[in-house]
Amino acid sequence: MNHAQTEGINLIFLERSGELRTEADLAQLPQHLSDPRSLIWCDITGIEGGQQGPYGQLLRKVFGFDELTIEDCFTTNHLPKVDIYDDYLFVVFFSFHLSEKRQRVETVEVDMYVGKNYVVCIHSRGLRELDRVRRRLLSHDEFVSASPANVAHTVFDAVVDEYLPIMNRLSAIVDGIEDELLAAGDASDAILDSLFHLKHELSALGRLAVPSRDIVGILMRPTVRLIPEDSQMYYDDVRDHLVRVIDMIDTMRDYLSGSLDIYTTQQTQRINRSMQRLTAIATIFLPLTFITGIYGMNFSYIPESNWRYGFFAVLALSTFLAVGMIVYLWRKKMI
């Protein structure tokens, strides 16, 4: 095995002898590519320079990859996908990372080529998942070193293994939002903003996880010759992990939608109770307004205006009507 650390490019050559040659460099790539019994790991960090930069030229001139796949490597905003060529596979998938400070999931696109004797990964920044793959290769891991299909599986497995802890952390955040939302009664704008943001985030993660599951399913088909049958059982384990991740995403989205529905129902009930009280108050004062309205008209002659006890009689009548309305509304359970 030969290992070289070139600026932005990590190379590992597994040779027939199994030796580790530290002096290996990019100049040795064509020689190893022409040897079907070699195994090459090429990990490229950074997409600076674009398609015409040094990394793009490496993919084009040394590996001979299709121009459309090279374009995909140096542009963003893709969905996971797999393109099957005669002598290699091109796979796009995503690494998830949770920002504890911002409580948001950041995604990093990983583009991977899988050939008969090589695996090439391209990503915009360093990923600890791929560092673990590199360490396993350098430790002469028997499974990983067996074939490019096993290396590709190890990459998938390392990336997907990071999904579950993130889903568990998001689940705890969802539970916290749900508890705050239902306990607070009147939710603050911050809680509602967190809820809507998390729903949007889960939808985005679902749009990445579902096609990733489908990709693994495609790679397990017998027609994909670069993934031998003895490696497919390991890919099935990755697919099971992705199915679990998708189920967790759907469950969390349902919890958030249910919490929002309950909160909306509570708010509606609260408004209805307020309207009921206002209606009761208006009903109580309606006869009083009627009476005072009549006696407030500017006429020279108003009944009982010259009666000594007229004011007290009207006051007593108003009180009687008000008490009567209160008793009536109370019996009707409106107040």
Predicted regions, residues:
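Hydrophobic alpha-helical transmembrane segments and their immediately adjacent juxtamembrane loops
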Residues: 240-335
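Peripheral, non-transmembrane regulatory/ligand-interaction domains of membrane transport proteins
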Residues: 1-251, 304, 334-335
